[in-house]
């Protein structure tokens, strides 16, 4: 559940406990999904959970892979990243190892310049892979300017959501001074948000929910 979408665990559980009517047959996964989504009270995380389960079941029943269902070529697909969750600094090496199959790593920062640099340096001590950074709305303008310049030197590809979603003024200012592209996350909840952030960010993080 996401607070950004006004969802809570309790609100999700209330819908599930009230009961979801499942169609008897799944001749079409899209129509099957729509029948279930109509009962989800617009709770996007719940819709995504059902969508994943439905597509997985459909592909297994029809003995095809997910990329075959979407008629997609894995070889030409954009490269995705593996997110490293930083808790214990002593476990960074283990976290980096977990992301071995991925060519790109993503790390959440926004804990202050000193801590953020410490985390990136630690990751760099284990790998030279491309890193993507999510500042998680944790910086101010001065920090953003310093960090973006420093992160460029560390082989970082882009910075996601450097400031609070309400702080578009500083985001626009940082974009002028940052050597790295800025990607919107909390500022792009739905497609209707895009006109407001056009020219402020270089791209958006599209959530499949």
Which residues are covered by each model-predicted region?
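Catalytic core of soluble alpha/beta enzymes
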Residues: 107-209
């Amino acid at each position: 559940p996401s607070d950004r979408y006004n969802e809570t665990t309790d609100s999700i559980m209330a819908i599930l406990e009230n009961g979801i009517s499942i169609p008897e047959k799944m001749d079409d996964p899209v129509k099957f999904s729509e029948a279930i989504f109509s009962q989800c009270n617009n709770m996007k995380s719940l819709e995504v959970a059902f969508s994943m389960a439905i597509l997985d079941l459909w592909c297994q029943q029809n003995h095809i892979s997910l990329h075959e269902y979407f008629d997609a070529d894995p070889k030409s697909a954009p490269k995705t990243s593996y997110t490293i969750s930083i808790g214990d600094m002593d476990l960074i090496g283990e976290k980096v190892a977990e992301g071995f199959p991925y060519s790109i790593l993503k790390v959440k920062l926004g804990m202050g310049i000193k801590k953020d640099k410490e985390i990136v340096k630690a990751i760099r001590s284990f790998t030279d892979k491309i890193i993507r950074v999510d500042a998680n709305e944790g910086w101010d303008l001065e920090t953003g300017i310093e960090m973006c310049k420093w992160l460029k030197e560390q082989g970082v590809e882009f910075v996601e959501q450097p400031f609070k979603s309400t702080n578009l003024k500083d985001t626009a200012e940082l974009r002028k001074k940052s050597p790295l592209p800025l990607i919107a996350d909390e500022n792009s909840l739905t497609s209707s948000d895009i006109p407001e952030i056009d020219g402020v960010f270089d791209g958006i993080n599209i959530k499949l929910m």
